[in-house]
Amino acid sequence: MDLVKLQKSLDNISFGILFATMLIYWLGAAFPRIPYLSILGSTGMAIANLCIATLLGARWLEASYFPISNLYESLFFLTWGITTIHLIAENMSGARLVGVFTSPIAMGISAFAALTLPSNMQISEPLVPALKSNWLMMHVSVMMLSYATLIVGALLAIAFLIITSGQKVELSGSSFGTRSSRNNHFVKYQKNWQLQKERPLLKEIKNNYKPFPQSTKNDHSQTSVLEITEVTQKVDPEIILSPERLNIAQILDNISYRIIGLGFPLLTIGIIAGAVWANEAWGSYWSWDPKETWALITWLVFAAYLHARITKGWQGRKPAILAATGFAVVWVCYLGVNLLGKGLHSYGWFL
């Protein structure tokens, strides 16, 4: 079997499947009443994931080292990670809207690797001496998985911002679930655009109320008095989310938090492994190389995100903006440094 031809075929097939999957997800978002589109989207993403895994396996057999040593290999490894995390997120949330945002990114990365990179960068070459280490798999693979996880989590935060754009949304569910009940409030929308929340406590007061005697000026009969004041809040109809969109926003907020919570420890482990490897290879744990600096910036951004959510109880728009910032920082750390700068990680630089 010609492994080189197999790899070339698989990278083109992966791109084609991801492109078709992206269109399916977009059609599903435009026409949600067509039931089989969501199944086709998930199936397409799973097939693309399998094709990329086979491509990486063929490259491993051909080159005899784990395929994350150059930009082409790392791009497809990143795409495989994104499709894997996508499938996990979709299964956890039950929201097919996830694919509307993740499939274009996965397709774009595979297109860049398969169609844009020069052919000489797509072939396997012997490892440079600095990469002939067991730390290659440990450090680079964990870093790439953290990038994939953080990218998907940040994408879902961006999706939250898009869905709730220009609208005031207050989420009151727990950050640890995907379908939390907004504090058991019964919410009903009235025609005069008044939002009325009736809490279980009010119902309990009504049920358990015992009348007490009160004299009136007109007669001396004993009457029962219970005065209940219901407070309503007038809300501009333009800022009210429909119950369906509010539920989707809640799911996206929660699942984004959980995925970023998975990606952050992976990033931490990857940075620590890289520091140990750097000490073995270059005699220093930290040298403020551009890649190291941006990895630290990435870590700080997502550390701030998790700190705000865990200790400050942030939900909704504020942490989503932090995650969206992290999305840009991850790409600078991964591609920007390699494409636009030189340093100890210059083996990926080609511009």
From Swiss-Prot:
Pfam families the UniProt entry points to: Cytochrom_C_asm
Classification of source organism: Bacteria, Bacillati, Cyanobacteriota, Cyanophyceae, Oscillatoriophycideae
Record's bilayer topology term: Multi-pass membrane protein
Transmembrane segment boundaries: 12-32, 37-57, 68-88, 97-117, 143-163, 259-279, 294-314, 320-340
Main localization, broad class: membrane
Species in which this protein is naturally found: Trichodesmium erythraeum (strain IMS101)
Protein name, per record: Cytochrome c biogenesis protein CcsA
Subcellular localization: Cellular thylakoid membrane
Keywords: Cytochrome c-type biogenesis, Membrane, Thylakoid, Transmembrane, Transmembrane helix
Gene Ontology molecular function terms on file: heme binding
One GO location term (cellular component): plasma membrane-derived thylakoid membrane
Family: Belongs to the CcmF/CycK/Ccl1/NrfE/CcsA family.
